[in-house]
């Protein structure tokens, strides 16, 4: 499954089966409240709706597992979602706002909506000093767009290319919509 492959790539060395086993074990005890706090990054912020629906389909989000508060990456993290291209940020914003408006989750709490709104604002408003390159977004085959490349994105690109050399899984196969991150030099 796509969610599983992505999670194993992001948390290299972690086996998805261990995550499933732990969540299924804890799910047996209705007296336990589980808090999910996924750290948002370049690799997963745009996929938040799919992640939440996957967790809900697995039974990990229900009336007992109902506290979800996505977290920003720590200061100095190279893979901060704020470094995404502006056009990609706008697509992500639209997707997340629609997801929250449609209320497809059994979890309908204001803290989750406020947190996602705050993360979107933080992402859109972020500005820095950087150079610009041109590339095509995956959903737009005709027009190129620009990517403001920071040292952090250069490091992400370097890391991705290194991981592709040593891992069995290739970044482009797992994150095709983010393949532009491999070419930010």
Task: Give the location of each predicted region.
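Radical SAM enzyme [4Fe-4S]-AdoMet core and its adjacent flexible, acidic
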Residues: 1-185
């Amino acid at each position: 499954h796509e969610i599983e492959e992505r999670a194993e790539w992001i948390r290299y060395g972690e086996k998805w089966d261990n995550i499933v086993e732990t969540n299924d074990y804890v799910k047996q005890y209705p007296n336990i409240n589980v808090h999910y706090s996924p750290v948002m990054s370049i690799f997963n912020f745009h996929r938040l709706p799919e992640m939440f629906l996957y967790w809900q389909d697995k039974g990990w989000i229900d009336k007992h597992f109902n506290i979800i508060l996505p977290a920003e990456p720590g200061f100095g993290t190279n893979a901060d979602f704020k470094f995404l291209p502006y056009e990609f940020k706008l697509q992500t914003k639209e997707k997340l706002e629609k997801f929250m408006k449609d209320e497809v989750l059994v979890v309908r709490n204001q803290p989750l909506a406020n947190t996602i709104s705050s993360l979107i604002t933080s992402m859109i408003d972020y500005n820095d000093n950087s150079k610009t390159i041109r590339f095509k977004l995956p959903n737009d085959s005709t027009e190129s767009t620009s990517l403001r490349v920071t040292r952090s994105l250069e490091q992400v690109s370097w890391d991705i290319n290194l991981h592709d050399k040593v891992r069995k899984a290739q970044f482009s196969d797992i994150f095709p919509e983010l393949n532009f991150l491999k070419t930010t030099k």
